[in-house]
Regions:
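A short, polar/charged loop-to-alpha-helix boundary motif
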Residues: 62-74
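Amphipathic, hydrophobic secondary-structure cores in small proteins
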Residues: 24-64
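Cysteine/selenocysteine-centered motifs that mediate thiol-based redox chemistry or coordinate metal-sulfur cofactors
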Residues: 74-93
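Ser/Thr- (and often Asn-) enriched beta-sheet segments in non-cytosolic proteins
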Residues: 4, 9, 71-73, 79
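Phosphate/ribose-recognition catalytic cores of enzymes acting on nucleotide-derived substrates
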Residues: 10-13, 44, 69
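N-terminal first-folded block
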Residues: 3-30
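Intrinsically disordered, low-complexity and often Lys/Arg-enriched segments
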Residues: 1-6, 89-93
Length: 93
């Protein structure tokens, strides 16, 4: 499964149902060397070249239950249709 956010396609998608956290990564998560937080509170991970390689969404189920687009500023502001993330969260249920 892959999920595209803005111009980045994340090919590693993992949902931790116990913690309700959705992890999105491009390739090996260990390539992330810099970390930041979006204004909306989502964790962002970058590689050595400054390219976005990971997003962590806390309270993923709550975000999906709202049925409103999820906003992430990375640095441009993007929205994600909850339906695009739902399969990742539902697969762990």
């Amino acid at each position: 499964m892959s999920i595209t956010v803005g111009h980045t396609t994340f090919d590693r998608v993992r949902y931790d149902a116990e913690a309700d956290v959705l992890y999105l990564h491009v390739g090996d998560p260990s390539q992330a060397v810099d970390f930041d937080e979006s204004p909306e509170g989502h964790a962002l991970r970058y590689d050595g070249a400054g390219k976005l390689v990971g997003i962590t969404l806390v309270n993923a189920k709550q975000l999906l239950d709202g049925a409103k687009p999820i906003v992430i500023t990375i640095p441009e502001r993007v929205t994600i249709d909850p339906a695009a993330l739902a399969p990742a969260v539902q697969s762990a249920a």
